[in-house]
Structure formats: structure tokens, C-alpha cells
From Swiss-Prot:
The keyword Nucleotide-binding does not apply. It holds the Pfam family PrmA. It catalyses: L-lysyl-[protein] + 3 S-adenosyl-L-methionine = N(6),N(6),N(6)-trimethyl-L-lysyl-[protein] + 3 S-adenosyl-L-homocysteine + 3 H(+). Its EC number is 2.1.1.-. Its main location: cytoplasm. This is Ribosomal protein L11 methyltransferase. S-adenosyl-L-methionine binds at residues 162, 183, 205, 248. Gene3D superfamilies: Vaccinia Virus protein VP39. Belongs to the methyltransferase superfamily. PrmA family. Signal peptide: none annotated.
């Protein structure tokens, strides 16, 4: 089978929404080429430093690549992708160059080439994310391993917004907590909360592709007894009192349910938000405070921030 590689030159801010657009269009895998990765020291499973090739990365911005099967619907699909990406401008998302190129690759190239980008990555004091095809031996007895398959929707979970959220969950979630994950995507945050011994985790996403992906990942990581994934629009119709609510989605979306999150939390409960580009930090912070929250910590990585707020 022949595959079409769609390459989009964009900004850090636009990486996550564009990746989601590509997955919803049927992309079988997404590769993110970020020059900031060249500055990170990485280790392989044997503790050896491995090097990334600078020729694989742009001088500025980020390149997002996706793969679609070549068929009679490809042209229509690509046009739809372009239109949906351009619509992100309505949400004040900087698209940068926003150049889109298309090339053809064969089955073997597509099936193996993207694996060079993915290795086990330790993202917090406790958590390491491991691609499903890698054999990994924990370095510490209390290390928590999350297995992810980037061939499934929503990538491997090493994007800064996800990393910040997991670091925040590690600090906040206590044994026996009741947790809500809004806009779960891959389900990785729900998996992390379950591994931190939450009593229950309810994960919600409006996108049926995300719901299916999250359910598969929850099962893969053997936390189905704790984490439940359902299709739902943000917090609509949700009741009860909870200890932690986590949301890794666009700042503009977070602003729509800050008050609702406040009402669903117990006194002393925490609202962890991420997916916030630096320039939107103050706007989200003010909205949280207006809803009644106290900001207790702001974490940052590259151009992104995560805000931990307390009721």
C-alpha cells in the first residue's frame, strides 16, 4: 500500500490541535519534529546517550507529519485538513508559516521510519513513558511505567503539556482520591492518576476516536478497574464531589468551565490545568481566581504552563 505523508510547518502552540485534527482525519500515526528536542539529553534503555539528527528538524517552528492511505478520497481529506487547520485562527492560535507539503511513501518506510523518534522517556520523579515495542527495565523500585503506542491516536504523551500535567498529578493526587480527567485524549493522565492509587478516575472526551484510544490505553496499562472512559462534552451533566480535576486542553476551552470545575470539587480539592501557551497564562490565572480558586503553583516547560489551583 502507498501512503501520503502530510507535512505541516507550524508553531509550538499549534502542535496539539493540529495533531488532533490529523488523527480525526484518519491519520495512522503522527510525528512531531521539534528543534528543541535537539537540546535535550536523552538516554536509551541501556543508559547510553543517543543522538538525534539535526537534519531531521526545522531551523525554526515545528513540523507535524501525518500519514494517510492513498485512495480516491485523499484529495477531499487533505482539503478538509487544510480548512480545519486554518479555522484555528478563529481561536487566536498562531499557525506560524502554516505551509503544507505532501509526498508519497511506501508501506515499509511508513511502518518503521517513525520509530526512531520514540524511546523510553522519564518525565517525572516516578513516571517513565515507554513505547510498546521497547523492553524496559525500571531503574528504581518505585518507578511507574506507562506504556503508549504512538501508532494509536494522540501520540506518546511526551508533549510538554502532558509532562507538566503528570508532574502536577504526581504532586497532588493522594491515595483514595476521586479524579476527573476532562478532554482525556489518549487517556494518559487518567492512567497516571490510577497508578498514583486514586480510588476512581472518570475520563471524558467528546471525540469518539479519543474515547476509543483512551479505553485501549487504559486496558493496555491494566488500570481498567480504576479508570472509566466515557464520551461527554467537558463537564456537562457531571455531578458529585471530587478531589482532583485535571484538564489538558486549549486555554480557550478551560475558560468555559472554570466555575463548573470549582462547584464539582470538594473544599481543598485541586484543579490542574495545562495546554496553556505562555501568552495565555494570565488570562487563565485570572479566570481561575474569579471562579474562587487560589493559585498554588505554576509549572512551565518550553512555551507552555500548567496551573495548579485549590478550592
Amino acid at each position: 500500500m502507498k501512503w501520503s505523508e502530510i507535512s505541516i510547518h507550524t508553531t509550538h502552540e499549534a502542535v496539539e490541535p493540529i495533531s488532533n485534527i490529523l488523527h480525526e482525519a484518519g491519520a495512522s500515526g503522527v510525528v512531531i519534529e521539534d528543534p528543541l528536542d535537539l537540546m535535550k539529553e536523552r538516554e536509551n534503555v541501556y543508559g547510553e546517550i543517543y543522538q538525534l539528527d539535526p537534519n531531521d528538524y526545522p531551523d525554526e517552528g515545528v513540523i507535524v507529519k501525518a500519514y494517510l492511505p492513498i485512495n480516491s478520497f485523499l484529495g477531499e481529506t487533505v482539503d478538509g485538513i487544510k480548512e480545519t487547520i486554518n479555522n484555528l485562527l478563529l481561536y487566536d492560535i498562531d499557525l506560524g508559516r502554516n505551509t503544507i507539503t505532501i509526498s508519497e511513501v511506501n508501506e515499509e518506510e511508513w511502518a518503521t521510519a517513525w520509530k526512531k523518534y520514540y524511546h523510553p522517556v522519564k518525565i517525572s520523579e516516578k513516571f517513565t513513558i515507554v513505547p510498546t515495542w521497547e523492553t524496559y527495565t525500571p531503574v528504581h523500585t518505585d518507578e511507574l511505567i506507562i506504556e503508549m503506542d504512538p501508532g494509536m491516536a494522540f501520540g506518546t504523551g511526551t508533549h510538554p503539556t502532558t509532562v507538566l500535567c503528570i508532574q502536577a498529578l504526581e504532586r497532588i493526587v493522594q491515595k483514595g482520591d476521586r479524579v476527573i480527567d476532562v478532554g482525556t485524549g489518549s487517556g494518559i493522565l487518567s492512567i497516571a492518576a490510577a497508578m498514583l492509587e486514586a480510588e476512581s478516575v472518570h475520563a471524558y472526551d467528546l471525540d469518539p476516536v479519543a474515547v476509543e484510544s483512551a479505553r485501549l490505553n487504559v486496558k493496555l496499562n491494566k488500570v481498567s478497574d480504576t479508570a472509566e472512559v466515557k464520551q461527554n462534552n467537558l463537564l456537562d451533566g457531571i455531578t458529585g464531589e471530587h478531589d482532583v480535576i485535571v484538564a489538558n486542553i486549549l486555554a480557550e476551552v478551560i475558560l468555559r468551565f472554570t466555575s463548573q470545575a470549582y462547584d464539582l470539587l470538594k473544599d481543598g480539592g485541586h484543579f490542574i490545568t495545562s495546554g496553556i501557551i505562555g501568552q495565555k497564562k494570565q488570562e487563565v490565572k485570572e479566570a481561575l481566581e474569579k471562579a474562587g480558586f487560589t493559585i498554588i503553583e505554576i509549572l512551565s516547560m518550553e512555551d507552555w504552563v500548567s496551573i495548579i489551583a485549590k478550592k
